[in-house]
């Protein structure tokens, strides 16, 4: 995460995305408020989190503290897979703006937060709240048909 924090501070979003793609031999597409289609399946990604007042992190939505602004979650489009850093169960704005727009939602940030399988919401964090690797990471298997779109 330090690489991401340092990179975000020094690069534009487009430069950051190009760098992440190069570092992974084009195997990772970093989504910043955008839709991406792969083999007929649509993904929407947004990295923003609400500010954490005791520390500065990459992808904090610092405008979240103001009364009038455009919430980045308003941009979320209909998709098969929604990928967010923030957990919709702990962020009312995310929960509100993503409601009904996805078939499955994968998120992290609240590392020990729970998943709601009956709502197709899955906490996919691979670290615990203590920043230790999980002994048994959660594996989520979903079935999406290209015909579902």
Residue ranges of model-derived segments:
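Conserved catalytic scaffold of divalent metal-dependent phosphoesterases
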Residues: 1-97
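Conserved beta-sheet core of the metallophosphoesterase superfamily
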Residues: 87-149
């Amino acid at each position: 995460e330090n690489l991401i924090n340092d990179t975000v501070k020094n690069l534009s979003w487009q430069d950051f995305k190009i760098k992440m793609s190069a570092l992974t031999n084009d195997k990772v597409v970093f989504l910043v408020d955008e839709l991406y289609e792969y083999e007929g399946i649509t993904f929407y990604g947004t990295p923003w989190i609400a500010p954490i007042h005791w520390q500065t992190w990459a992808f904090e939505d610092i405008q979240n503290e103001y009364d009038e602004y455009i919430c980045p979650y308003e941009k979320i489009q209909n998709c098969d897979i929604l990928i967010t850093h923030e957990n919709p169960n702990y962020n009312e704005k995310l929960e509100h703006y993503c409601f009904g727009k996805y078939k499955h939602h994968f998120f992290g940030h609240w590392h020990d937060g729970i998943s709601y399988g009956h709502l197709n919401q899955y906490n996919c964090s691979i670290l615990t709240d203590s920043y230790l690797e999980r002994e048994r990471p959660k594996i989520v298997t979903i079935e999406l048909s290209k015909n579902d779109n």
